[in-house]
Amino acid sequence: GIDSTVIRNPLTQQPYIPGSSLKGKLRCLLERTLDKTFDHPGGSGVYRHECTDPTCHVCRLFGSSAATRNGEEDNLPARIMVRDAHLTPESLGKLEKVEGGLPFTEWKTENGLDRITCAANPRQIERVPAGAEFAFEMVYSVEATDSLSEDLSHVIEMLALLEDDALGGGGSRGNGRISVLFDKAVFRPRDYYLGKEEETVRELGIAPSSAGKLPGEALAVFAR
């Protein structure tokens, strides 16, 4: 059998990228970039930085859940929401034609060798074929305009850094390389939800790794 499988929608069997995986990776990259101390134990023995300081770039953006400080528990709600990423219709159509026994995916056989005895330890992993496209959405809640530019710049910078890193397991073995394309930025003011104002849309079609002007382009959406 397959030792490591992808996560799928139980109704359609289509693979998807959990928003928690992408958000967690971006948080980790920002923690490393800002040289934060990993002082808070998380699940599976993983440590991360967590505090309730509203000036902390990491926790202000990604949130802090029930961090215990001085005997009190406080929450710092995340300003950013990362939704699950699903296959685009075009990629879905291509992957439906893939032959190999697994719907929409492939399996890769790897082999570990004992450095002393040279005994083989074969394993099989499931992965989405290279070139598959996923559509994802990130929602940023504007709580303070004075930190808006800084927060969005951090998100864009971490997505650019992710292109030189990897998403998911096995990154050092060729898995998880991604590229990002910003399709558009949308601003919905309070009056939009009251039916009094239209949303503002800016078409982007640009990659974070090759566009230093992107923060300005994205922030232009919020110019009233």
Give a label for each model feature:
Residues 1-224:
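RNA-binding basic/glycine-rich loop and surface signature characteristic of RAMP-family CRISPR effectors
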